[in-house]
Every structure is written in structure tokens, then in C-alpha cells.
């Protein structure tokens, strides 16, 4: 395998981390007490030329865990009725087990070592994901315990915007505000945004790194 081909592997792009786009809709801001209501996950892949693309999607409506808190302000914001039977909600345990099975498979197939959460304002989603994994008592958590890729920060650097809708529009993506705050829609837009930023950096010559050129242009 040539050096160029090696750089075009997903495992070599993010130092063996397997990027997984996550969006979580919740019934509040406290990951230990407030219910997770909806989770969407999108895996990513790199083509033979090293361009990043969306791959597979998982999407679950979640039943509030026993004893969890439902904040009225939160559900008024995301417009989720936690107890509507038409949601087709499943248990948090089943959702998390399905997610981790998918992530572990991707890590293995892509030759990576662990998953890394990609999210918009990633601290929020990462905290809720870690709390949910802890609640369902899964010991082998494939995700990095604290490192994330935050598209709010990345888009602030790339296009000068940190709000998801504004960042998408600034980079040339459409955004439907009527679909916002759905975990599925927001994860799709976050994945599109992340891929655009990564691919734009590559297109500008930022990846793969030219070590000699980087030393000459160092500040």
C-alpha cells in the first residue's frame, strides 16, 4: 500500500479513532437524572480517494428510564411527547446495546481502536451518552471517555458560525428549521457539516500533511 493510500484510510485520518455522529434529544440538561428521549447515530466512511462520506444510520425513540425526570420546558422545546405510543419507543438498554454493537463492528472493520463522538455542542451529547451507557451497565464502552469532535467549534473555525443552521448554510448546505431538534434530522445535518469541513480542508491541501511544507510555513 502506498503512502497516499494509507492516508486515505479512515483509521489513519483521525489517529485510529472511529468517528460516529450522534444527536440526542432529552427531557432536560442533567445527564444523570433527565430522560433520553431520542438518539440518532450515523457512521462515516472514506472512499478510495480519501473523501469522507456518511455510511449507516441508526435511529431510536427511547422510553424514559425508571425514575427519570421529564422537564416541561425541554419537551416543549423539542416537541416530543415521551409517552405517546405512536413514537414506537424502545428501552434505553436495547437502544444502547444496538448502538454499541454497531460501533464495535465499525471499529473492527475500519481497523480503528475506539469510537469518538462527533456532535454539535458535543459536550452535551457525549455526557448523555456516557450516562446512558453507565446506566445500562455495559463495561466495555468503545467510545473515548472525554475526547470529542465538536462541529460547533469546527464550523466556527471553518466558516465563522457556531449555530448548526447557520453553519450549514454558510458551508453550502440547506437547513429546514421545521425539522430541527429531531435527533435524526440534526444528526444528518451534523454529519453533512462534518464531512464538508473535513473534505474542504483536504481540498485546500491541508490533508495529508506535507511535513516539509509545514515546517517551512510554521508560525
From Swiss-Prot:
Q: Which GO terms describe its biological process?
A: DNA replication proofreading; tRNA processing
Occurrences of domain Exonuclease (ranges): 20-194
Say which domain of life the source belongs to: Bacteria
Name any GO cellular component annotation: cytosol
Please give the InterPro entries that the UniProt record associates with this protein. Answer: Exonuclease_RNaseT/DNA_pol3, RNase_T, RNaseH-like_sf, RNaseH_sf
Cofactor dependence: Mg(2+)
Q: Where is this site: Important for substrate binding and specificity?
A: 29, 77, 124, 146
Q: How is the cofactor bound?
A: Binds two Mg(2+) per subunit. The active form of the enzyme binds two Mg(2+) ions in its active site. The first Mg(2+) forms only one salt bridge with the protein.
Pfam families with a match to the protein in the record? RNase_T
User: Which positions bind Mg(2+) 1?
Assistant: 23
What molecular functions are annotated in GO for this chain? 3'-5' exonuclease activity; magnesium ion binding; nucleic acid binding; RNA exonuclease activity, producing 5'-phosphomonoesters
Active site as annotated: 181
Keywords tagged on the record: Exonuclease, Hydrolase, Magnesium, Metal-binding, Nuclease, tRNA processing
Uppermost EC category: hydrolase
Please give the SUPFAM superfamilies that the UniProt record associates with this protein.
Ribonuclease H-like
Per UniProt, Mg(2+) 2 binds at 23, 25, 181, 186
Family per record: Belongs to the RNase T family.
Function as written in the Swiss-Prot or TrEMBL entry: Trims short 3' overhangs of a variety of RNA species, leaving a one or two nucleotide 3' overhang. Responsible for the end-turnover of tRNA: specifically removes the terminal AMP residue from uncharged tRNA (tRNA-C-C-A). Also appears to be involved in tRNA biosynthesis.
What does the subunit section of this Swiss-Prot or TrEMBL entry state? Homodimer.
Question: What is the protein's name according to its record?
Answer: Ribonuclease T
Species = Buchnera aphidicola subsp. Schizaphis graminum (strain Sg)
Record gene name: rnt
Amino acid at each position: 500500500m502506498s503512502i497516499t493510500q494509507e492516508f486515505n484510510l479512515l483509521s489513519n485520518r483521525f489517529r485510529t479513532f472511529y468517528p460516529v455522529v450522534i444527536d440526542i434529544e432529552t427531557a432536560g440538561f442533567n445527564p444523570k437524572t433527565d430522560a433520553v428521549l431520542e438518539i440518532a447515530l450515523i457512521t462515516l466512511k472514506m472512499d478510495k480517494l480519501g473523501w469522507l462520506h456518511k455510511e449507516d444510520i441508526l435511529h431510536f425513540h427511547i422510553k424514559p428510564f425508571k425514575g427519570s425526570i421529564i422537564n416541561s420546558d425541554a419537551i416543549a422545546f423539542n416537541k416530543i411527547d415521551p409517552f405517546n405510543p405512536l413514537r414506537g419507543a424502545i428501552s434505553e438498554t436495547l437502544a444502547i446495546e444496538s448502538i454499541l454493537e454497531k460501533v464495535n463492528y465499525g471499529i473492527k472493520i475500519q481497523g480503528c481502536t475506539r469510537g469518538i463522538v462527533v456532535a454539535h455542542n458535543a459536550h452535551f451529547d457525549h455526557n448523555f451518552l456516557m450516562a446512558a451507557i453507565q446506566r445500562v451497565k455495559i463495561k466495555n464502552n468503545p467510545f473515548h471517555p472525554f475526547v470529542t469532535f465538536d462541529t460547533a467549534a469546527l464550523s466556527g473555525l471553518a466558516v465563522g458560525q457556531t449555530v448548526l443552521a447557520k453553519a450549514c448554510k454558510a458551508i453550502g448546505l440547506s437547513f429546514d428549521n421545521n425539522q430541527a431538534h429531531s435527533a435524526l434530522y440534526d444528526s444528518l445535518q451534523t454529519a453533512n457539516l462534518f464531512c464538508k469541513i473535513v473534505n474542504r480542508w483536504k481540498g485546500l491541501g491541508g490533508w495529508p500533511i506535507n511535513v516539509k511544507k509545514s515546517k517551512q510555513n510554521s508560525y
